[in-house]
């Protein structure tokens, strides 16, 4: 028997990624000051983080983390079900549930882990089905595959497509899962219409609101609250602590019955160390600031509107998004990488997003905004985007003979 050589396989795949301009590189951040990063000795203004409210370096949150670390140490030392569930975890879960209007919350180390836990614990039969938007986050897609149930995907934002998929699978338990705000397009799911489909088809509605929490809705309560929905229409939702709240971790919110079931059966919850207490303390303080500081959301929305208006004035091909995620369509990978490099030479860090993260031919620059950005930074970024587009267009133009 001759097995395939894994080293040869990965070298072959690496060559293919090089040819397709799809290799990935980690950048080492030496220092951070708000939206300014030092990389290789140079300071860049970043337009690619998820620190939407500018809380990642907030002094109150840092103080809460330091105090909790001094009292509880740097780690939880065990899983939640052994001896890793601290009083600060309980307080954070209570605050999340009260803020978002859900009976209970359950903490996880990351949104990816939480999505794995939800589907593994709920969709336990082979004929169960999870119907998802085609552009859902990879963690939702992978969770269904790992759960072993059926996966059906509908065209992006297509409510009728979701209904069709559920109608065609009447047997087995069903879940209708969607992002709240889509991480690569920045648009918002039609949650009211989808919740009606879920109710009609007796499917459990599950919303991953990683990018909505803190940013949209009353008191920053996210996309579900912005759509005037509640636990009755959306029995289960996921929020992250790592984006608008500036820290690390995630939580799933739902009825007492659902949350207790997850705590007792979800393997990614049971068999992993609890979130560090200091991170929980930081998240608790961040939530209170996010609830209190409405001006951060107002400021962020003003910057979104300014970026979009300036981009339209310069003829930039921005996608249809009213959120802090503002993608600029570039088409092929080579052009996208060239524009990203040109922006870096002008002092901006904007990442190139390429397949398989986005569909073929849909490579883009994913601009993300923060309440910490200044209007001058917004304006100069748009000017730099327009210059890099024009320069690349000139270089690509055929020579007249």
Swiss-Prot record:
Could you say which enzyme class this protein belongs to?
transferase
Kindly list the positions annotated as binding substrate: 24, 137, 357
User: Where are residues bearing N6-(pyridoxal phosphate)lysine located in the sequence?
Assistant: 243
Question: Which pathway does it take part in?
Answer: Cofactor biosynthesis; biotin biosynthesis
EC annotation from Swiss-Prot or TrEMBL: 2.3.1.47
Q: Which InterPro entries match?
A: Aminotrans_II_pyridoxalP_BS, Aminotransferase_I/II_large, AON_synthase_class-II, AONS_Archaea/Proteobacteria, AONS_Proteobacteria, PyrdxlP-dep_Trfase, PyrdxlP-dep_Trfase_major, PyrdxlP-dep_Trfase_small
Required co-factor?
pyridoxal 5'-phosphate
Listed GO MF terms: 8-amino-7-oxononanoate synthase activity; pyridoxal phosphate binding
Q: What domain of life does the native source organism fall in? A: Bacteria
In this chain, pyridoxal 5'-phosphate is annotated as bound at 111-112, 183, 211, 240
Query: Can you state which reaction this protein catalyses?
Result: 6-carboxyhexanoyl-[ACP] + L-alanine + H(+) = (8S)-8-amino-7-oxononanoate + holo-[ACP] + CO2
Q: What GO biological process, any one, is recorded here?
A: biotin biosynthetic process
Q: What Pfam families would the database entry show?
A: Aminotran_1_2 (PF00155)
The record's annotation in HAMAP family points to: BioF_aminotrans_2
**Could you say which protein family the record assigns here?**
Belongs to the class-II pyridoxal-phosphate-dependent aminotransferase family. BioF subfamily.
Protein's job: Catalyzes the decarboxylative condensation of pimeloyl-[acyl-carrier protein] and L-alanine to produce 8-amino-7-oxononanoate (AON), [acyl-carrier protein], and carbon dioxide.
Q: What is this protein called?
A: 8-amino-7-oxononanoate synthase
Whichever gene encodes this chain, its name is bioF
